[in-house]
């Protein structure tokens, strides 16, 4: 299929759900700089292979935003696709929230996979479209419905980094981060960033090109830690080592259920630039969100 045919299929799914726009970003669920083949939804739909870009699909139009590194490449690869190239930073080029405000009707719906949209990006769209009472539908990955033979999520084996290379043991690092949590008044720290999880637990993987990390989230409390990961990626030996350091395993997608089950009064630390929108939406109203730069970034 070419991009025109793929967009037609996507629009058919949008129409079934009464969506007035659908946003497809380049990110995975963890705001990683590089993404695996499973997450190349924007590339699949548009044919544009650059590493940065966001596609917005409307019922009768589509546009792709990218930066100056890719203006020439994008103009060539989008030719004949029906997708307008939006050259970011150039005069007269609207930002994505402004275009959505101008093209989505009053009380309309904007769809996206909320696991791939950052909280900050969703907030910027919400602020720009609030006056028109535009709503979000983020529970479905519509690209998955039109992408036959989509590559599966990467699930390469996780391995342990020896402390002589890591510098500190897993227990020492966990104690350091828990100390920072206390200073910040947080009872729970949701860690979605793959590099931070890998550093904190002295684990490595091969799920992302050019980066020795593995698909995972960590829910850290003062007395417990839950690693949400594809279980088949973790050997029984590594699971036992983690358990001895107070880290238990849960299925990869359980992060949303675990966050939603946090008790009343929980103070949840997370980094809004790195946490996806679905995580933020999962936090109970009875809990308090502390949107701060991750303390791990400062270690």
Mark where each language-model region is:
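Terminal domain-start leader segments
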Residues: 1-299
């Amino acid at each position: 299929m070419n991009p025109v045919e793929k967009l037609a299929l996507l629009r058919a799914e949008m129409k079934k759900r009464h969506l007035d726009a659908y946003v497809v970003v380049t990110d995975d669920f963890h705001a990683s700089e590089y993404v695996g083949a499973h997450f190349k939804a924007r590339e699949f739909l548009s044919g544009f292979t650059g590493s940065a870009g966001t596609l917005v699909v409307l019922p009768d139009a589509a546009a792709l935003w990218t930066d100056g590194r890719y203006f020439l490449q994008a103009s060539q690869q989008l030719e004949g696709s029906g997708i307008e190239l939006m050259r970011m930073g150039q005069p007269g080029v609207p930002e994505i929230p402004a275009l959505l405000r101008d093209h989505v009707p009053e009380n309309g719906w904007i769809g996206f996979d909320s696991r791939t949209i950052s909280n900050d990006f969703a907030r910027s769209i919400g602020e720009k479209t609030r006056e028109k009472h535009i709503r979000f539908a983020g529970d479905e990955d519509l690209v998955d419905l039109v992408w036959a033979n989509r590559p599966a999520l990467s699930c390469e084996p996780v391995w342990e980094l020896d402390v002589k290379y890591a510098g500190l043991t897993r227990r020492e690092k966990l104690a350091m981060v828990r100390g920072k949590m206390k200073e910040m008044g947080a009872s729970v720290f949701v860690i979605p960033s793959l590099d931070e999880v890998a550093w904190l637990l002295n684990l490595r993987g091969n799920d992302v090109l050019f980066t020795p990390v593995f698909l995972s989230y960590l829910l850290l409390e003062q007395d417990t830690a839950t690693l949400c990961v594809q279980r088949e990626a973790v050997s029984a030996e590594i699971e036992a080592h983690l358990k001895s350091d107070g880290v238990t395993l849960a299925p990869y997608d359980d992060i949303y259920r675990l966050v939603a089950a946090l008790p009343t009064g929980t103070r949840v630390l997370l980094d809004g630039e790195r946490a996806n929108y679905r995580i933020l939406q999962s936090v109970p109203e009875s809990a308090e969100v502390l949107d701060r730069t991750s303390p791990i970034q400062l270690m």
